[in-house]
Amino acid sequence: MSPSPEQVMQFLYALRSRGVRDRAVLTAMEKIDRGLFVEGVFSGRAYEDVPLPIACGQTISQPSIVGLMTQAAEIGPRHHVLEVGTGAGYQAAILSQLARRVWTVDRHRRLTRAAEARFKALDLTNVTVLTGDGSFGLPDQAPFDRILVTAAAEDPPGPLLAQLREGGIMVVPVGQSDAVQSLIKVTRTESGFDYEEMRSVRFVPLVEGIAPENSA
């Protein structure tokens, strides 16, 4: 069921109050119905600013974090973007409204299949979904203008840094999975990488390898 106008207004107000001010990002988040990415008993909470459980022991991030990460990435209409950690597909759907091409990869085949079906239903033709080990990126499609990582790594993954174009931006949560992490904005420069700590966050860990087919 589509959200009411009042729900949408409250949703956008909550995003702005938490620092999401970029007009293009807000427009994308208004257009993409988060309710399409939340299932079961949690569907009624789709427009609350909270993370919610999804299949395979994963979560869909709270909308304000999605907005802040997208805003920090400074995505333009010509950009090629890699997302590591498809999850329900909500973040990739937002990215699709801003970028030329989006590649999103997840280690859980169950999640990528469900996300692909959602993208097809929404006619998001500029999103490519892949099942694989996202910690190694997608070398065949590199370099990327922007990379967003939606799971926490102990350090920004080297293979992803290597696949970032000069002038490109990566947004990644960094830290131990059982502790508060830091959201880091990495910019590739001519001489190396600049790191900016944005805020404290909590994400599921970035896990290497492809999950077993029968994972929950």
From Swiss-Prot:
Question: Which InterPro entries does this one have?
Answer: PCMT, SAM-dependent_MTases_sf
The signal peptide annotation in the UniProt record is: none
Q: Which keywords does this Swiss-Prot/TrEMBL entry list?
A: Cytoplasm, Methyltransferase, S-adenosyl-L-methionine, Transferase
Top EC group = transferase
Taxonomically, the superkingdom here is: Bacteria
GO MF terms held by the record: protein-L-isoaspartate (D-aspartate) O-methyltransferase activity
List where in the cell it is found: Cytoplasm
* Active-site residues per Swiss-Prot or TrEMBL entry: S61
Q: Provide the Gene Ontology terms for cellular component.
A: cytoplasm
Function comment: Catalyzes the methyl esterification of L-isoaspartyl residues in peptides and proteins that result from spontaneous decomposition of normal L-aspartyl and L-asparaginyl residues. It plays a role in the repair and/or degradation of damaged proteins.
Concerning its family, UniProt says: Belongs to the methyltransferase superfamily. L-isoaspartyl/D-aspartyl protein methyltransferase family.
Q: Which PANTHER family match?
A: PROTEIN-L-ISOASPARTATE O-METHYLTRANSFERASE, PROTEIN-L-ISOASPARTATE(D-ASPARTATE) O-METHYLTRANSFERASE
Could you tell me what this protein is called? Answer: Protein-L-isoaspartate O-methyltransferase
What is the source species?
A: Dinoroseobacter shibae (strain DSM 16493 / NCIMB 14021 / DFL 12)
Organism lineage reads as: Bacteria, Pseudomonadati, Pseudomonadota, Alphaproteobacteria, Rhodobacterales
